[in-house]
């Protein structure tokens, strides 16, 4: 194993990492926020000093054996999410990770231009996460959520208690 590549810092994507790293010695590649969350998790298992954590940004390309892994910006409910274009000897494999299309996101729009360019070049396989794909319609923009919260907050005279994913920093 030449490397472990993580798309974002949600628990369902990084939670098993301490257990994997007890069996596999490989560098961990991710974006800054994702690595920050990973570091906290590794501290719980006394693995930080034993693990090579490598910071990347959208647009970076990492060589891993005969593969190169390209980081592509995507929008998700956690900042610093990426997809991967894995360039292999037989073709390009795209792993989207979790993503959404939100043109008003504080974290920037998913890089549809790069996905389009890769599509024109030819994609051997697309591995695409698709939460709620069975629902009709589309996911509303975060700006709609923000407007709704503003209306409720302005009308409240006392305490307001709100719950949300702690990793959804833009909403917080």
Language model feature labels by segment:
Residues 1-5, 10-172:
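His/Asp/Glu-rich metal-coordinating catalytic cores
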